[in-house]
């Protein structure tokens, strides 16, 4: 029917636009042409629509995604680990106000920012996560510290913030995460910008796979709410 065709058309446009904001680099040996290492990232493209995207904004998104992708790929190209590649790639997106992670995180209904992140090493099946953190500049790095420095899988809230400080990670005031765009989104509770997650999957030269995710969650979410992003096996997995 015309209705179903119209609906399918809208879905396909979103899929195409999602692919446009999901970027991948792959490295190939000179002889057999098989991919031996690579990197795939996304910047929360499920919440980015053509209607709300100017050419300038699109260029800015692509530029930052390319920067993140290049940084992670350089690590893999030099023989570095997939875990290092995932962490540095996501840190770059967390440091940008463009994405709903780190600096660009959305606001809770209490007007604060609560961030979640997780990382997993496919070679060992070890994972780490933080949830509901308010003062950790780069939650993805805290998630890795949980994995490597504790016998836990997840730390949440004040306990996670305190742990990150103990580990020497950079701590910021909660207002560091403030951006005018996200504050306005809270006021308007716009569906188009209510959620989003950044993510990265890397395969290194040793054949080890790692994955990481980071998010600010839902705009206007109830404070204390934790979504699927930091849940290993739900929002993130590598094997």
Describe the residue ranges of each PLM region.
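Alpha/propeptide regions of enzymes that mature by internal proteolysis
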Residues: 31-239
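Bacterial Sec-dependent N-terminal signal peptides
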Residues: 1-34
């Amino acid at each position: 029917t015309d209705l179903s065709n119209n609906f399918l058309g809208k879905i396909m446009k979103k899929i195409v636009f999602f692919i446009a904001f999901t970027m991948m680099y792959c490295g190939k040996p000179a002889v057999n042409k098989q991919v031996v290492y690579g990197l795939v990232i996304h910047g929360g493209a499920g919440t980015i629509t053509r209607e709300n995207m100017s050419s300038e904004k699109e260029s800015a998104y692509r530029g930052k995604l390319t920067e993140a992708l290049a940084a992670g790929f350089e690590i893999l190209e030099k023989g570095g680990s997939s875990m290092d590649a995932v962490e540095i790639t996501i840190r770059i997106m967390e440091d940008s106000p463009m994405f709903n992670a780190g600096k660009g995180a959305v606001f809770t209904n209490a007007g604060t920012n609560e961030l979640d992140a997780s990382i997993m090493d496919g070679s060992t099946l070890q994972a780490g996560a933080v949830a509901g953190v308010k003062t950790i500049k780069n939650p993805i790095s805290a998630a890795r510290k949980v994995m490597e420095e504790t016998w836990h899988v997840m730390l949440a809230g004040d306990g996670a913030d305190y742990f990150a400080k103990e580990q020497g990670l950079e701590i910021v005031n909660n207002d560091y995460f403030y951006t005018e765009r996200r504050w306005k989104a809270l006021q308007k509770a716009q569906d188009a910008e209510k959620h989003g997650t950044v993510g990265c999957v890397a395969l290194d030269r040793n054949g080890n796979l790692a994955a990481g995710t980071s998010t600010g969650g839902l705009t206007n979410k109830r404070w204390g709410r934790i979504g699927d992003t930091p849940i290993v096996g739900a929002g993130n997995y590598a094997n």
